[in-house]
A protein has these predicted regions:
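Bacterial N-terminal signal peptides that target proteins for export
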Residues: 2-14
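Helix-rich interaction surfaces within compact, conserved domain-sized segments
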Residues: 102, 113-161
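Short, solvent-exposed, charged loop/turn and helix-capping segments
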Residues: 95-113
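Amphipathic, heptad-repeat alpha-helical segments
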Residues: 68-75, 82-85, 89-96
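Charged, amphipathic alpha-helical oligomerization/scaffolding segments
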Residues: 56-59, 63, 87, 91-94, ...
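N-terminal signal peptide c-region/cleavage motif recognized by signal peptidases
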Residues: 22-24
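Immediate post-signal-peptide N-terminus of mature secreted/exported proteins
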Residues: 29-80, 159
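Non-transmembrane, amphipathic alpha-helical segments
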Residues: 45-57, 77-84, 105, 112, ...
Length: 161
């Protein structure tokens, strides 16, 4: 791993821990660090197959899915308390930081994962604001669905809704 890569991971994780206000800066830094030419903006399969995963990614996505699944009925009924949305956002941020810090994906799979990470971070930021909390949760649920559809993680349990 290069010094630049280690420094990027340290900065990214620290930034996540300090504030979600830096989501756009984090996303721009992530895109700059992993720029492999043309930016990918929509999910794609790997020549018709799902992308490979690593253990940290599987673990982090499972924890995010479990946290959302525990509250999905209240999210759908629009009865989830704001403090629960904030707690969910915190768990998402923790797990995203973990998957970034421990990422060992090949570059093409990593580029696809960045689309999901962007949606997770955007959703978690929205969940911290009462006026957009439910929409943020829906964005996270959609990101989890994309993970299930595009990454080969046989242990992953998508959100039941």
């Amino acid at each position: 791993m290069t010094i630049k890569s280690n420094l990027f991971k340290c900065v990214a994780v620290t930034g996540l821990a300090l504030s979600l206000g830096s989501v756009s800066a984090f996303t721009m830094a992530a895109e700059e660090e992993h720029d492999h030419g043309q930016a990918i903006t929509e999910m794609q399969l790997n020549n018709g197959s799902k992308w490979g995963i690593d253990a940290p990614l599987s673990q982090a996505m499972a924890k995010i899915s479990q946290a959302i699944n525990a509250e999905v009925e209240s999210i759908h009924a629009d009865t989830l308390a704001q403090e629960n949305y904030v707690a969910l956002a915190s768990e998402i941020n923790t797990q995203v930081a973990y998957m970034i810090e421990n990422c060992e994906l090949e570059p093409a799979a990593d580029a696809q994962l960045h689309i999901i990470i962007h949606d997770l971070m955007d959703g978690s930021a929205s969940m911290e604001n009462q006026s957009s909390a439910r929409n943020g949760a829906v964005k996270v649920i959609n990101a989890l669905g994309n993970y299930a559809n595009y990454f080969d993680d046989p242990k992953f349990q998508p959100v039941a809704h």
